[in-house]
A protein has these predicted regions:
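Residue(s) in the substrate-gating loop at a strand-loop-helix junction
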Residues: 137
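Conserved glycine-rich cofactor-binding loop
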Residues: 13-14
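The beta1-alpha1 cofactor-binding region of Rossmann-like NAD(H)/NADP(H)-dependent oxidoreductases
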Residues: 58-69, 99
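Conserved glycine-rich Rossmann-like NAD(P)H-binding loop of the short-chain dehydrogenase/reductase
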Residues: 27-42
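Active-site helix of classical SDR
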Residues: 117, 153
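C-terminal helical subdomain
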Residues: 177, 197-234
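Substrate-binding pocket helix/loop in short-chain dehydrogenase/reductase
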Residues: 93-106
Length: 261
């Protein structure tokens, strides 16, 4: 595999990450996929049908030890495409949440993601080429009432990825951030938000979201907001007071809001 094209995808056991991995396999990239659950192995088996080598690494990417395990699995191989997609959500009121759950969201969405970007981004820069895609979110554009921690982490990723892009602009490494809206994955179930309006509303297809992000990355674009409805929502957010956005978000994410229509 030393001389083959290699893509690394985190959070690839389901949802957007799994769809991104499919696109890489379609285009002949050998894959190292990672997630913190055994389902990553089933995902690898399915991807192997595309005729590429797929290695699955089960690792807790919220920890430095888990990220180090992934890096050890990569070894000294050159990474052509890096998809920083692993992430978690958390709904309900901030002060009502167990602190360990809050910390895990921050460590997964920010700490582990940034650590992996630091380690592999440096290798790409020394090599003089590579592409990085962060999965951010349009949630980063608005104060997330009843999703305060999650939206805060995505605001960080949206900002960090664009800053990193401009730091690396002369190295041959491109950085792109994918900003989806609500997508049909296990996100809202895991975040305990199935009694909310946003949790039960119609959502985007993860395959469509992944395709938009993949194409933007391969074209070297700075950012991509997937879906015209999400583009309109972000445009409106830019001219709406933060307090108004926070109240709008409350109506979507407040527990039992699904039963208020």
């Amino acid at each position: 595999m030393t001389n083959e094209k290699l893509a690394v995808v985190t959070g690839a056991s389901s949802g957007i990450g799994k769809e991104l991995a499919k696109l890489c396999a379609r285009d002949g990239y050998h894959l190292i996929i990672a997630a913190d659950e055994p389902a990553i192995r089933q995902a690898a088996e399915a991807l192997g049908s595309h005729g590429v080598t797929v290695e699955a690494i089960e690792a807790d990417l919220a920890t430095e030890e888990g990220v180090d395990r992934l890096i050890a699995g990569i070894g000294d191989r050159d990474v052509d495409l890096l998809f920083l997609n692993a992430g978690r959500g958390l709904g309900r009121g901030f002060v009502d949440q167990d602190w360990k759950k809050v910390r895990r969201i921050i460590d997964t969405n920010i700490t582990g993601t940034v650590y992996l970007a630091h380690q592999l981004g440096a290798r790409m820069a020394r090599r003089g080429r590579g592409r990085i895609l962060f999965t951010g979110s349009i949630a980063g554009f608005m104060p997330g009432t009843f999703q305060a921690v999650y939206n805060g982490t995505k605001a960080f990723i949206d900002s960090f990825s664009i800053a990193l892009r401009h730091e690396l602009r002369d190295t041959g490494v491109t950085v792109t951030v994918l900003m989806p809206g609500a997508t049909k994955t296990r996100f809202f179930e895991r975040a305990e938000m199935m009694d909310t309006k946003v949790g039960t509303d119609e959502k985007d297809n993860p395959a469509d979201v992944a395709e938009a992000g993949y194409e933007a990355m391969m074209d070297g674009e700075e950012q991509i907001i997937s879906g015209w409805k999400n583009k309109l929502q972000v445009a409106a957010a830019h001219v709406t007071p933060a307090g108004t956005l926070a109240e709008q978000h409350r109506k979507m994410a407040e527990p039992v809001s699904a039963s208020k229509d």
